[in-house]
Amino acid sequence: MAEIRNYTMNFGPQHPAAHGVLRLVMELDGEVIRRADPHIGLLHRATEKLAENKTYVQSVPYMDRLDYVSMMVNEHAYVMAIEKLLQIEVPIRAQYIRVMFDEITRILNHLLWLGAHALDVGAMTVFLYAFREREDLMDCYEAVSGARLHAAYYRPGGVYRDLPDNMPQYQPSAIHDEKATRARNENRQGSLLDFIEDFTRRFPGYIDDYEALLTDNRIWKQRLVDIGVVSPDRAKALGFTGPMLRGSGVEWDLRKKQPYEVYDQVDFDIPVGANGDCYDRYLVRIEEMRQSNHIIKQCVEWLRKNPGPVITDNHKVAPPSRLAMKQNMEEMIHHFKLFTEGMHVPRGEAYAAVEHPKGEFGIYIVSDGANKPYRLKIRAPGFAHLAALDEMTKGHMIADLVAIIGTQDIVFGEIDR
């Protein structure tokens, strides 16, 4: 008699729905998944080890490259941990700028997640719409830091520089003539705050467009409802955070429960799911984009009325201005020491966590009093989510695996570190 056995199949690391370099070794009974074993490490770059050989400020750009879709939020956790060790106050204007860019980054992340998730499931249009909006937010990154992706904008003690008074302008090219260029530059005539305010006015309408395409779409609901269900207790036991935890009905958000920066001074709600399935996690992230938009509006309003310093005046931590450095010998020494040797952080240890678009992103630093960390540990939210993939997919069809990976919002930069 013929023996009936499950067969083993590789999913990824080249599969377009694998979100980077995910490799799954799956045990299948026909089309039903019996086991899904994630193999990680293909994007390991030894970030934690590299940070031990760099000064504290030199490691800021490494943070951008962890979750390379949520750049500034990674930096935020890192500089907050350093500030805890240094026990320095961050100027209130810098705190508002950080919160504003954290929420811009959250929208950037969720737009990419939405576009990629819909594309994996088979809806192409949303992907194109999402990238149209991402372009405007990338321009905000570029205006403050000069880079569209790896900004390296946050610094221990504040941010690199204040918000610019004018936006970069498009130039005529072979593709766009003078008239088309004028139309493209229409909302770029004012400052960065004007540009962001214009975006916040338009964005709720765009979210309505995404929802019109997906939320009540029969095929979308058939692919997501009752797929990858996780109960509230199980979500907590598995170490879920962020939208994955809130999608299961647990109202936990670090911005509300353990407020940092000025999150206790802005108004927003925590969206929570009811059933803990892929569809609930989709709805939670959609509503998070609306809440982020609301927070950005409040930050823009406050920043308009309150000019001020954007980085600490402690020159043992932050460099003096270029003008002061060229006029004063003491400032020049500070500048030279900071950029050659770096700052010496007091002996001790600190953990700082932020509400990252994917969950709780934490940085744990151990300092031995030198100008480099003795040890840096990164707590990546996606790591716990990926570890639960086997449990979430068991008993589902192979087509549902793609929907579950999409709903986890996995980026391998932070998982492999």
Curated annotation (Swiss-Prot):
Protein name (Swiss-Prot/TrEMBL): NADH-quinone oxidoreductase subunit D
Family from the record: Belongs to the complex I 49 kDa subunit family.
Subcellular location(s) per record: Cell inner membrane
GO cellular component, one term: plasma membrane
Keywords attached to this entry: Cell inner membrane, Cell membrane, Membrane, NAD, Quinone, Translocase, Transport, Ubiquinone
Record bears the keyword Protein biosynthesis: no
Biological role: NDH-1 shuttles electrons from NADH, via FMN and iron-sulfur (Fe-S) centers, to quinones in the respiratory chain. The immediate electron acceptor for the enzyme in this species is believed to be ubiquinone. Couples the redox reaction to proton translocation (for every two electrons transferred, four hydrogen ions are translocated across the cytoplasmic membrane), and thus conserves the redox energy in a proton gradient.
Catalyzed reactions: a quinone + NADH + 5 H(+)(in) = a quinol + NAD(+) + 4 H(+)(out)
One Gene Ontology term of the molecular function aspect: NAD binding
Lineage: superkingdom: Bacteria
Gene (UniProt): nuoD
EC number: 7.1.1.-
InterPro entries cross-referenced by the UniProt entry: NADH_Q_OxRdtase_suD, NADH_UbQ_OxRdtase_49kDa_CS, NDH1_su_D/H, NiFe-Hase_large
Primary location group: membrane
Record text on subunit structure and interactions: NDH-1 is composed of 14 different subunits. Subunits NuoB, C, D, E, F, and G constitute the peripheral sector of the complex.
Enzymatic class: translocase
Pfam families found in the cross-reference section: Complex1_49kDa
HAMAP family associated with the record: NDH1_NuoD (MF_01358)
Protein topology in the membrane: Peripheral membrane protein
